């Protein structure tokens, strides 16, 4: 199972600093939507230049103009881009077309989708590299939230998937048992007093 760090910071400088601290422990460096909105596509280029051996994941959350938005992110240096699962099938197919042209990949983010397992199967058929079983920060903040719903959807879907929704060391075994290909950790790393140590601990927890 791969480890992905989600960098939900707001400046290129801060993103590069965090990426530099944790790169040796992670496989995928995700640039969060607020970061890309704050700094533009140049942050993708900067991080890929600093870490050419890592998979750079641009969380574009594209909802329309799939081919165009994916193309500009790939040209900026992204290896993976996200399209929302609630987007029209033609939008996802357009992003996949751009990915094929660049030899890159599209991840379909299932945030806000009620029947994640069914939609996961549909978008995989459209050419998604994998799907992200994702609960956003707002959903995670609700009383009683846990990862079990995401893990169950992943197991049911039987397609390649990642899990994002407050993953931490204690939940890594469950994420791995569910069959996830990627565990996404954001706050567990960037919110830690020592992000490098936190990333190292997450890496060590992956069997």
Curated annotation (Swiss-Prot):
PANTHER family: 3-KETO-L-GULONATE-6-PHOSPHATE DECARBOXYLASE SGBH-RELATED. It comes from the Bacteria. This is 3-hexulose-6-phosphate synthase. The keyword Lyase applies. Gene3D superfamilies: Aldolase class I. Pathway: One-carbon metabolism; formaldehyde assimilation via RuMP pathway; D-fructose 6-phosphate from D-ribulose 5-phosphate and formaldehyde: step 1/2. InterPro entries: 3-hexulose-6-phosphate_synth (IPR017553), Aldolase_TIM (IPR013785), HPS/KGPDC (IPR041710), OMPdeCOase_dom (IPR001754), RibuloseP-bd_barrel (IPR011060). Signal peptide: none annotated. The gene is rmpA. Induction: By methanol or methylamine.
């Amino acid at each position: 199972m791969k480890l992905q760090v989600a960098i939900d910071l707001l400046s290129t400088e801060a993103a590069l600093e965090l990426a530099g601290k944790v790169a040796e422990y992670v496989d995928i460096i995700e640039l969060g939507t607020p970061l890309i909105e704050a700094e533009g596509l140049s942050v993708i280029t900067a991080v890929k230049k600093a870490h050419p051996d890592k998979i750079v994941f641009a969380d574009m959350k594209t909802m329309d103009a799939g081919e165009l938005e994916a193309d500009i992110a790939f040209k900026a240096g992204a290896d993976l881009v996200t399209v929302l699962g609630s987007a029209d099938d033609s939008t996802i197919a357009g992003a996949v077309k751009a990915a094929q042209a660049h030899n890159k990949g599209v991840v379909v983010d299932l945030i806000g989708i009620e029947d994640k397992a069914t939609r996961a199967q549909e978008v995989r058929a459209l050419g998604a590299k994998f799907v992200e079983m994702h609960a956003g920060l707002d959903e995670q903040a609700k009383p009683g939230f846990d990862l079990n719903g995401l893990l169950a959807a992943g197991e049911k879907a039987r397609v390649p998937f990642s899990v994002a929704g407050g993953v931490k060391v204690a939940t890594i075994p469950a994420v791995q048992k569910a069959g996830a290909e990627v565990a996404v950790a954001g706050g567990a790393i960037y919110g830690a007093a020592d992000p490098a140590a936190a990333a190292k601990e997450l890496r060590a927890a992956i069997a």
